[in-house]
């Protein structure tokens, strides 16, 4: 439904990242389990500097590095929208949509209703990094070296999990192995 509203308001003249970002952001507002959520992989993308700059976010959908990066583009777009709303208000989004409908380029519309892109990018990076660092702070998100634990040896993984009970990789792998055995 959100796509219908935004596309009508912009006369179908809006970049995919902004359309998807608004929709995923709205999904999360409606219900916390809806929409793209932070994941260990997204956390790593953010902390490893793999976010696409806001001014080039359309490229994340057009030429992604991998299928995972396409999914991350949805999430990143939604947190850009979240950042805009938190820092510049909901009117900022509405004003950008209006300008897009008048043929204004997205980056110009953002600068007119939020901040210069360089300053916006700086603030957004701090915001996204904060979200990433706050994600599962008690979890061990490191993937062990294959020499440390053989990823093909189910018993070795269980043993390693017993020694590292908060390790997400070991938990996920053990669960997947148990499901496979069923």
Predicted regions and their residues:
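Active-site His/Glu-centered metal-binding helix of metallohydrolases
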Residues: 1-6, 22
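Acidic/His/Gly-enriched intrinsically disordered linker/tail segments
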Residues: 9-151
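Helix-turn-helix repeat elements of alpha-solenoid scaffolds
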Residues: 145-155, 179-182
